[in-house]
Swiss-Prot record:
Phylogenetic placement of the source organism: Eukaryota, Fungi, Dikarya, Ascomycota, Taphrinomycotina
Subcellular location(s) per record: Nucleus
Ranges where the HTH CENPB-type domain occurs: 70-144
Listed SUPFAM superfamilies: Homeodomain-like
Protein name (database record): ARS-binding protein 1
PANTHER family: PROTEIN PDC2 (PTHR19303:SF73), TRANSPOSON (PTHR19303)
Subunit structure and binding partners: Interacts with mcm10.
Organism the protein comes from: Schizosaccharomyces pombe (strain 972 / ATCC 24843) (Fission yeast)
GO terms under cellular component: chromatin; condensed chromosome, centromeric region; mating-type region heterochromatin; nucleus
Amino acid sequence: MGKIKRRAITEHEKRALRHYFFQLQNRSGQQDLIEWFREKFGKDISQPSVSQILSSKYSYLDNTVEKPWDVKRNRPPKYPLLEAALFEWQVQQGDDATLSGETIKRAAAILWHKIPEYQDQPVPNFSNGWLEGFRKRHILHAINEQPTESVVLNNTEPPNDPLSRVYDVTRLTNINDIFTMQETGLFWKLVPNGTPEVEDIKGITRFKARITLTVCCNASGTERLPLWVIGYSQSPRVFRAANVKPEVMNFKWRSNGKASMTTAIMEEWLRWFDACMEGRKVILLIDSYTPHLRAVENIRNSGNDLRNTTVITLPSTSASISQPCSEGVIYALKACYRKHWVQYILEQNELGRNPYNTTNVLRAILWLVKAWTTDISPEIIENAFNLSGVLGLFNESAVTSRALDEMIHPLRELVSEFSVQAAMRIEDFISPSEENIVDSSEDIINQIASQYMDDRAFETDEEESTEFQITTKDAMKAIELLLNYEAQQPDGNPAITISLLNYQKLLEARGGNVNLSRLRST
């Protein structure tokens, strides 16, 4: 896949894209919109840009009429990509009235060095005249707030007792309808005693072989929504080689130049979550991370609020309440993943292969999907909610569960084969501090600048893929093998046999009734 060259998208083009999308009776997928935009304007546009333009952040464009003289009056800026990035940075800062001219100029200079198109050019003199023009071109459009069903508790509210305020909401709700969501980074190639590797891509420092995971579950541990995985490439090499569809494999894939959560992705996630909760009234607990706050604000101001979800933004500085996922859920997920990864390393070493070269991001995600859907017990999730305090007074009897300890023990044994020291420092391997999500002004600038990086056809540190497409005939042979295996087991399970036979029937329909007798004889 060739590189996508970033070019500034004008307000006229954004308005046209929104108008085209929202007037469709059968809404197009984002790839269809990318093709439409290319044919219409002769430009390439990335999937994250499409998602952002369709978000409520640009809903003001729907309520304005483009006047014939607008194009002449609002002449394009000399540095359109810079101003687009700077405006996004300004929005992320909140009330632009608090930003001095010098602050905006400093941010412009930093962004200039990080946007690839400008890196070989000298930094302009950001004069007061330029500043005045920028402010005129990028007035923050106020949107009339509509009544909203969402309840948002955050650090801007009176600092009384955050525990009791959250509990006032959760105590009236069945625990099956109380959800939490949180992100974490993951170095999917990290080895015991290893350190995360970094790379500099045109002024933006980022980690190699890193993804961001978004996990969401309810307080009883009975519901775990599919993982959202954010990487660097819009379509990693291995996805194309294996012809995989992420949704079929129970995860969703998004991308940007920092492999991190953005306001646009978070807003998309919130609306997806709300659609998953159709017909219910649920509570969603999120933390006070800037993309979360901006996404919630965009939705509340859009006039198209969440229908089934009450959002509670947890205070980030409270000693009495914490994010449930931080109380063992994410740690358990990472521990399960590391166990699969270390087992793979040892197996590949025995075969004389380099596991660092033979693995890929798809295999890593499948280990994560397995860990999330089958390896983590409901007890770990329930215990995490009790420890967090979101369900009421802190439960002092809630301690790290035996299930979590039992999960870590086999990993420690495996890691000890590398070194005793690595086994003793198992926590640093399971969840290194560099994987923590950081919310800082420098991080915001890097996230914004990364949107203007050229798309890559592969993940960082991703080797040439050795994955191959599985034919229906291959799948049928595998089913036959599994049926025979299950029939030979002393504790064979009829339910498994029935499931395999049902899947076999599905394969027959897909493959045009492949001849089973021929399969058995080959």
